[in-house]
Amino acid sequence: QMKLANDGFTQAVDTAETNAVPGWARWRTEVFGFALEPVVMLISKKDFANLPVPRTRHEMLALIRNNSSIFKDRIGTYNPETSGAGYLFSTQDARQSDTFWRLAEVMGRLNAKLYCCTSKMIEAVDKGDLALAYNLLGSYANAILPANSNAQIIAFEDYTHILLRTAIVPITSQNPAGGIRFLNFLISSDGQSILDTEAKLPALNNSVIDKLANRKPIRLDSGLLVFLDRLKKAHFLREWNAALIQN
């Protein structure tokens, strides 16, 4: 949606509701965040029964490196070549910390499995096929996992990326006035309450997410467009393949 707006395919929406959206959760007057998605780790309780739960990526790196017999073939993460979310999370990790590339190399040596989507990783951890899944959407896991699940959600303490679900009004909309009304409702107090309590999509002011240690919202700014450049994306994916896939 950022690229669509940058390329001129979205309408400006200037209302009291859109003006109330925090600056980090909107881009110009065209792209607006309406819900939050913490990016988390999922662990298998059975596999971690006698292991310390890592709270930072440095701890995760040391843990999987020192327990290769447990984690060999049993770590999952997004495939950034086929998943837009996976590419976004990987590039944000790389921007945030050099640990990402060391982590990718170790996961590669342990033959990490690559996935298209969060739901597949959740299922694999819950069944015990994976011991750990890295960088998946927390709200999906909260919505899908039963109370007695084998899977446990872990939010890192060094930093937790927060993905923004966003909305736009396309210039091709056949009912732009209706689109603006719906957008205004999404980001209104009533709309945010419904998203938070009924749709199970954390609202922009969600109190649980607000308390996460070192939360890092993926801000809607021009930095997101950098990695959409064709040459930069190709370079990043080459580095990724060299680190993780290690062909």
Language-model features, listed with the residues they occupy:
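Extracytoplasmic ligand-binding site segments that recognize negatively charged/polar headgroups
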Residues: Q1-D126
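A ligand-binding cleft/hinge motif common to bilobed small-molecule-binding domains
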Residues: Q1-K3, D126, A131-N150
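Periplasmic-binding protein-like
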Residues: G23, L36-E37, N67-I70, L103-G108, L114, F185-V208, ...
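A bilobed periplasmic-binding-protein/Venus flytrap-type ligand-binding module shared by bacterial periplasmic
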Residues: V40-D47, F89-T91, L163-N175, I194-L195
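Loop/turn elements at helix/coil->beta-strand transitions in domains of secreted/extracellular proteins
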Residues: I70-R74, G128-A131, S149-A151, G179
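Short amphipathic alpha-helical coupling segments at ligand-binding clamshell hinges
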Residues: T99-L103, Q174-L186, I194-T197
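Extracellular/periplasmic bilobal clamshell ligand-binding domains
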Residues: K211-N247
